[in-house]
Curated annotation (Swiss-Prot):
Protein's name according to its UniProt entry: Proteasome subunit beta
UniProt activity-regulation remark: The formation of the proteasomal ATPase PAN-20S proteasome complex, via the docking of the C-termini of PAN into the intersubunit pockets in the alpha-rings, triggers opening of the gate for substrate entry. Interconversion between the open-gate and close-gate conformations leads to a dynamic regulation of the 20S proteasome proteolysis activity.
Organism, scientific name: Methanococcus maripaludis (strain C7 / ATCC BAA-1331)
Known role: Component of the proteasome core, a large protease complex with broad specificity involved in protein degradation.
Pro-piece positions: 1-14
Gene Ontology BP terms: proteasomal protein catabolic process
């Protein structure tokens, strides 16, 4: 039998995800590799999800736990909109997720989350959540997963407090690209999105390839 601590270690050691707070929105990025121990289990893993018109989230950890949580939160966001006529705010969504995670703290959902959103009143918001519901509201950037130490190195060097989404996209892609070169549990491409006053925009593989070419030209 696998103990809870051993299970936690097995499922929390892969992935790289990053989030950047920009002056006009939020940028989120993840790699696409899913691992089980030393096995690359999936080369097209989805780790970036649109939750609502103005909210998106990245996942790291146990895929099943994260997907179950995403289905629940997406449904709650739809119900909220039907009842009130308004979109759930990023803070409200984060608080709801935190309550669900904390309610399961004795049998925790083995996932670490980054939530980015745009509040039409209060602007861009970026949060990170731990497996038992702890919330951090980020004022600049954050990263999770086994490749996060490398990603943080790039983010620390490249991030500026007045960064725009256009620049933030390049910084996020560069951070992911660097992490994938150094971390065996991250790789197989990048998923990328931004959230601003116009909503969630998820980029195509072709658009991401264009960002990679811009970065490589500067090296």
């Amino acid at each position: 039998m696998i103990s809870n601590s051993e299970y936690h270690k097995e499922y929390m050691k892969g992935t790289t995800t990053v989030g950047l707070l920009c002056k006009d929105g939020v940028v989120l990025a993840t790699d696409k590799r899913a691992t089980m121990g030393n096995l690359i289990a999936d080369k097209e893993a989805k780790k970036l999800y649109k939750i609502d018109d103005y909210i998106a989230m990245t996942i790291a950890g146990s895929v099943g736990d994260a997907q179950s949580l995403i289905r629940l939160i997406s449904a709650e966001a739809k119900i909220y909109k039907m009842r009130t006529g308004n979109n759930m705010t990023p803070l409200s969504c984060t608080t709801l997720i935190s309550n669900v995670l904390h309610g399961n703290r004795h049998y925790p959902l083995l996932t670490q989350l980054i939530l980015g959103g745009y509040d039409l009143i209060n602007g861009a918001k970026l949060f990170s959540l731990d497996p038992v519901g702890g919330i951090n509201e980020e004022s600049s950037f954050t990263a999770t997963g086994s490749g996060s130490p490398t990603a943080y190195g790039v983010l620390e060097a490249e991030y500026r407090s007045d960064v725009t989404i256009d620049k933030g996209l390049l910084v996020a892609v560069k951070a992911l690209s660097s992490a994938m070169q150094r971390d065996a549990y991250s790789g197989n491409g990048i998923s990328l999105a931004h959230i601003n006053k116009d909503g969630v925009n998820i980029y195509s593989d072709e658009e991401i390839e264009g960002f990679l070419k811009k970065i490589n030209k500067k090296r």
